[in-house]
């Protein structure tokens, strides 16, 4: 991605995080109950990424095209929740299409060559207190240790990304 506006008022691109060994890209939004359920877990992951030996970064991207997910609404949400990760808007939806993302939240781990090493759900349930399988953290741990990821894809849990509608009918 290039020049995606962030809630911090800056433009962001892959180059901002390309020095990391791994980048966690999460497609999320303000309006999906599942995405809201994951906000604290995404923030915890971001704080983990900020540790000196983490070797990864977290970037959140909102591709929804509804008023509740406007950049202004995202800025408000980011301030309220004090997000420590870049929260970017994908107004053209080009980035979500390029990744093949269909739900919020949906997680991807990319290596420094931009190869997707994991995609899908962060864990096995939206209810934080009932998590048994931590797919994303397990994949990150394996990658950081130079091991193969055993589970490379899981079905994402969440709401469909709200794509921009194009009128096809012309009278």
How would you name each of these model-derived features?
Residues 13-37, 140:
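Short active-site neighborhood of thiol/selenol oxidoreductases, capturing the structured segment around
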Residues 75-119:
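Short, internal strand/loop/helix patches
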Residues 36-81, 91-98:
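Structural microenvironment flanking redox-active thiols in thiol-disulfide oxidoreductases
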Residues 19-23, 53-57, 83-85, 112:
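Loop/turn elements at helix/coil->beta-strand transitions in domains of secreted/extracellular proteins
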Residues 1-15:
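N-terminal "domain-start" segment that seeds a small globular fold
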Residues 109-171:
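Thiol-/selenol-based redox modules, centered on thioredoxin-like
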């Amino acid at each position: 991605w290039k020049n995606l506006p962030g809630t911090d008022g800056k433009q962001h691109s892959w180059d901002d995080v390309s020095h990391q060994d791994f980048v966690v890209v999460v497609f999320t939004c303000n309006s999906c109950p599942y995405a809201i359920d994951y906000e604290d877990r995404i923030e915890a992951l971001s704080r983990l990424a900020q540790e000196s030996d983490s070797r990864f970064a977290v970037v959140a991207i909102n591709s929804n095209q509804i008023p509740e997910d406007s950049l202004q609404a995202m800025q408000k949400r980011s301030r309220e929740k004090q997000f420590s990760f870049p929260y970017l808007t994908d107004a053209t939806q080009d980035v979500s299409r390029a990744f093949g993302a269909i739900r919020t939240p949906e997680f991807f781990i990319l290596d420094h060559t931009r190869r997707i090493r994991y995609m899908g759900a962060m864990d096995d349930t939206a209810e934080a207190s009932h998590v048994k399988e931590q797919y994303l953290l397990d994949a990150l741990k394996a990658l950081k240790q130079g091991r193969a990821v055993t589970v490379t894809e899981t079905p994402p849990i969440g709401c469909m990304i709200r794509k921009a509608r194009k009128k096809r009918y012309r009278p």
